[in-house]
Amino acid sequence: AEYNKHKNDKGYVNEAISKDLVFDSSIVTKDTKIDKITGGKFIKASDFNKVNQGQSKDIFTKLSKDMNGKATGNFQGSKVSAVEFGPKGGYAVLLEKNKPVNVTYTGLNASYLNRKITKAEFIYELQSAPSQSGTLNAVFSNDPIITAFVGTKNANGKDVNVRLTIKLYDANGKEVLPEKDHAFAYALSSLNSSLGTNYSVEHAEFVSDFG
């Protein structure tokens, strides 16, 4: 009914797409977690949470600093908490240009054409960042639907550009790939922008180059 109401609206597809891939909030179980993170440098929780006197302690302030490539934490020592990261928190990691970071989730209850998906890999590769050091701070949530928050200190106005590759696996460890007539359908949310005269800093978030 909702599709029929909007099918002629701009931004909607002309024909309804079946939901063959189930990967939404319903797939999160009590066992869902980040099993491991490889390829990146862990930021100590104490370093991530550090703010200057008088600064806000919100996550966006904590993300908006340049670590200058210095991150000497470990997996467990990088765990941070905030309501935005979900009830199980997340892990603070430093991304460096052209160095992929692999975040592996286990304990999933997802599916594709009734084939159970229990594991997912989210591979992030930084392409550019506006910090002086060229690095980007990230917090990867233990909830794969919340996914990640990123930020750094803006020194030169460059775009934040991150390439994301997602791989899904069944209970036997075999990668799940889309079939020709049953494409994966993506719904993207929390893409924010601040454009116009009411904002001191203009920015827009978008996704491009699917494939």
Model-derived segments and their meaning:
Residues 4-177, 192-211:
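N-terminal/edge-of-domain interface segments
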